[in-house]
Amino acid sequence: CNVYQMQESKQFEVVYSFGWYLKKFIQDVYEKGAHPILVSLTPRNEWPHGKMERRNDTYGKWYREVVAETEVPFLDLHNIAADSYDKIGKEKVKEYYKKDHTHTSLKGARHNAKCVAKGLKKMKSPLAKYLK
């Protein structure tokens, strides 16, 4: 963890790693009596080498480390969506994002939701029975 002083308030704040926050989320969900499923981040609309960029060496790695440690179900939305965007193609995928490379349009959000449904079915989640 790191301690930072906030510019406006001058108060100090402790900031933990991404993995720490994932584990905290999992713990909080279990404490509420629910069953967590980790879902990775959506891919960015960046296309080095003709394919949508995968971030499996940073966020993807951190998700997998937490999943290995906690044995929580993991839906790899990042790669499921990136694979489908590769098939759609770089030019057409521009319609799925707003003006930046991170935030999707409504069309992109709907596409990502379909990818979540596909992932839930593939992992044989109990939630899959509620999907079309």
Where are these regions (language model features)?
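Alpha-helical cap/lid subdomain in secreted, periplasmic
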Residues: 1-106, 110, 114-132
